[in-house]
Amino acid sequence: MAATRSAHTVWNGDLFAGSGQTTLDSSGLGTFDVTWKARTEAAEGKTSPEELIAAAHSSCFNMA
């Protein structure tokens, strides 16, 4: 059985000074703030694409 999941991100501004929000559409678990600074420096309560991929990989690995 195939499972389809979706999320989307809305970004405002340029790469370094801008910010965005990633929404987990399928689960409805929430909307998370993302910034370049949080991705490359201190997280300061924000997530990053790498953290979201790590969470997905970790949960898939444990179900294998």
Predicted feature descriptions by range:
Residues 1-58, 62-64:
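Extended beta-strand/beta-hairpin segments
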